[in-house]
Amino acid sequence: MDGIRVYIETFGCTFNQADSEIMAGVLREEGAVLTGIDDADVIIINTCYVKHPTEHKVINRIKKIQETYPEKGLVVAGCMVEIDPSKLEAISGDASWLGPHQLRRAPQAVRAASNGLVERITGFTSDVKVKVPRVRSNPLIHIIPICEGCNGSCSYCCTRFARGRIQSYPSDLIISEAREAVASGCREIQLTAQDTAAYGVDTGEKLSDIIKGISGIPGNFRIRVGMMHPASVLRDLDGLVEAFKSEKVYSFLHLPVQSGSDSVLADMERGHTVDEFRMIVERFRSEIPDISIATDIIVGYPTEEREDFMDTCSLLEEVKPSFIHLSKYRHRPRARSSSLDEIDFRELRRRSRALEELKMRITEEENRRLVGSFQEILVVERGRKGGFIGRTGSYIPVVTETGEPGSFRRVRIRDATGTYLLAD
């Protein structure tokens, strides 16, 4: 496939970004040329399908590309391929498909698309996504998928139909890849999975051992640990708290609770209680006082009553996370909760607006506590509108006028918003 020009566009999570980097690496190794969309012979859209708004963005983007570039080959990759093939067939029946477990077959799909043929490469494999060719989107940040899939049974989720049951990758390969990334100049290692704390449930290994192993690599760099399900954290709470104490690990805990009501959590089949979430947060904060907490909330689950919603508001007021990700509940393909009646849309909108206001107040209050303080930041990239973007030791984003990507700087925080800090 020497000389085939390929453009890759990515939607969704950090894991999807890693998938795109792997596809780019595999394609370049086979002789493809990575380029912008206008110059491409083949366009790859790596889809996300976890939320209803993202589904619409993905579908509209596929349609727009087909209208704008009818002469180019199209490969649709990512979660949509496995979750909703009937809808994909309806909107893009002439496109080739590449499932998220089939990244090494990207050259096969691209060759077909470049020749006007349709190739459908789907289904699960046992392919390992570490120590494979990569093209980093940011040369300073290396994303390592440590495991793929989920053994959970959340009633609202469709992602597991795309990613399958959990497959943990060998710890020695993960640590070796991190070592090579640091040696090549990376300043940030991101560990990603659908649930990083579930790492090793199938192999007997633990996430805490991975973190400790990477922390022992010589060099000045940071480790960001991705989202962890509370039920998975409980299996190794002591080890994780200890691992997070390393100065190389961002003091940042992404712990989705989804609801502040135990009855709703039970209906969601989350496998944990509100008190267990509280206990995990309190344990981390007691031993790592500067840790920032991120959590996710689903607003308007079908069985969420007004009292349940107020319990969620109360929990956020109590815990005061630094990052709060809100999603309005909408049915997802193949999810069990799709058999339930959705709540009235006007009520859903009211609850969502109320939570959005609460979120902005809490996150701005938390960020304003840092105004006037001095923080060491890792500058990770140039800002789109000028300046530079860095991260504090607690992973809070900082916008600064001066800097050099890859450098560590001590800055004074002069102002704050609900989403970032401003430094001198």
Swiss-Prot record:
One GO MF term: 4 iron, 4 sulfur cluster binding
Disulfide bonds: none
Record-linked Pfam families: Radical_SAM, TRAM, UPF0004
Entries under SUPFAM superfamilies matching the protein: Radical SAM enzymes
Domain TRAM, residue spans: 368-424
Alphabetical list of CDD domains matching this protein: Radical_SAM (cd01335)
Protein name: Probable threonylcarbamoyladenosine tRNA methylthiotransferase
